[in-house]
Amino acid sequence: MASDFQMKAMNKVHGATLKLSGGGLGWHMYGMPVVQLTTIGRKSGQPRTSLLTSPVQNGNAFVIVASRGGDDINPAWFLNLKANPEVTVKSGRKPAVKMRARIAEGDERDELWKRIMDYKPHYGGYQKKTDRVIPLVILEPIA
């Protein structure tokens, strides 16, 4: 599993690629769209931005996976959006959109997990590395 330092470094390199290319490169990774998720830090109150892949999309909603590579702890961005579910999401060259995050549960989570596994089975390897149930988060536009 990648360390916090490695994950932050990868995120910074990815962000630099987006910036240097004028947003022309970096919006797809491993065949999935990339979303730029901005949460409010649960401790700091400051904006925190992460670049994440979305293996499933439903209309204007994105599904993101709080796998943290199969680590035993949830990613900081997940803890932040649990504390404050109002987030900002940017994907591609489209403007950023205010969205609300919610955690998929029960049958909805089961159906989404199946879709994710059918499309990107490597997520199953992450689940095998940890005892926690990897959360699936749905990002929906605020009407």
What residue spans do the PLM features occupy?
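Short hydrophobic/aromatic beta-strand or adjacent loop that forms the aromatic wall/cage
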Residues: 34, 134-136
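Active-site beta-strand termini and strand-to-loop segments that position acidic
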Residues: 57, 140-141
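Extreme N-terminal tail/first-helix region
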Residues: 1-28
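Short, structured beta-strand-loop surface elements
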Residues: 68-122, 129-133, 141-143
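Short coil/turn segments at secondary-structure boundaries
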Residues: 28-30, 127-131
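Short helix-to-loop capping/linker segments positioned immediately adjacent to catalytic or ligand/cofactor-binding
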Residues: 24-25, 123-127
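Short beta-strand segments
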Residues: 32-67
